[in-house]
Amino acid sequence: MTGPAVQDQELDQFDKKILDIIQTGFPLEPRPYAVIGDAVGLTEAEALARVRALKERKIIRRLGANFNSWKLGFRSTLCAAKVPEDKFDEFVAEVNSHVGVTHNYLRAHAYNVWFTFIGPSWEEVCSTLDSITQKTGIPILNLPAEELYKIRVDFKMDEDPAAD
């Protein structure tokens, strides 16, 4: 489901610097790749080409803004399902067809499919989960958060590991 680990792939100093910038402070400018290029010593076209290459190599999975969905009125939940092997592809295809699915993982457990779902209201979340169950015949365990904890993780790429 995922590509090779980043440490298994060659990253030069330009790639590492670009990754640091886009993780922590993507420029909100009319020409962000020109700003990134200037910061790392490349042209705008070179910076953009490197970001595209990192995305193609699956080192960058997603490039976009993160919002506090709770403050915007959205609701989310962690979901789990016991999916028989013969229904796996059908179930995963149905789950992934919904724009509110933000993560979807296969686990070695009785509840073998785990995913998170976000919607504009709690009613919409529950309605969508009910719809998935009706279409697939597979019940979904709905585990809404009682309290939200956000942990920010930035993977510092342009550091000398020997400096620690």
From Swiss-Prot:
It is an enzyme of class 4 (lyase). Transmembrane segments: none annotated. Forms a heterodimer composed of AhbA and AhbB. Its EC number is 4.1.1.111. Belongs to the Ahb/Nir family. GO terms for molecular function: lyase activity. Gene3D superfamilies: 3.30.70.3460, Winged helix-like DNA-binding domain superfamily/Winged helix DNA-binding domain. The keyword Lyase applies. Pathway: Porphyrin-containing compound metabolism; protoheme biosynthesis. One of its GO terms (biological process) is heme biosynthetic process. The keyword Endoplasmic reticulum does not apply. InterPro entries: AsnC_trans_reg2, HTH-Siroheme_Decarb, NirdL-like_HTH, Siroheme_Decarboxylase, Tscrpt_reg_AsnC-like, WH-like_DNA-bd_sf, WH_DNA-bd_sf. Disulfide bonds: none annotated. Involved in siroheme-dependent heme b biosynthesis. Catalyzes the decarboxylation of siroheme into didecarboxysiroheme. Keywords: Heme biosynthesis, Lyase. This is Siroheme decarboxylase alpha subunit. It catalyses: siroheme + 2 H(+) = 12,18-didecarboxysiroheme + 2 CO2.
